[in-house]
Amino acid sequence: MASYRNSRSRSRSRFRRRRGRRSRVRGRDARQGRSSRRRRRGKGRAHSGKKGRRSGSRRRKRNNENK
């Protein structure tokens, strides 16, 4: 009986692990391969431009107030 129970538990754990890993890996691959690359590139360009504009406007406002 012990050997039969062990074989059952092992097979169940394997199926659970495989299913979990497969689903997680698919999600990670899809995100990293497609969307994250596009988002990272887009964000880098957009934020770099916006940061410069924001800091410039803030500096001008401060200078005007001081003057």
UniProtKB/Swiss-Prot annotation:
Q: Where along the chain is composition biased (Basic residues)?
A: 7-25, 34-67
Q: Any one cellular component term from GO for this entry?
A: nucleosome
What are the entry keywords?
Chromosome, Developmental protein, Differentiation, DNA condensation, DNA-binding, Nucleosome core, Nucleus, Spermatogenesis
Q: Does the keyword Nucleus apply?
A: yes
Q: Name one GO molecular function term.
A: DNA binding
Localization in the cell:
Nucleus; Chromosome
What exactly does this protein do? Protamines substitute for histones in the chromatin of sperm during the haploid phase of spermatogenesis. They compact sperm DNA into a highly condensed, stable and inactive complex.
Task: Supply the name of the protein.
Answer: Sperm protamine P1
What is the source species?
Isoodon macrourus
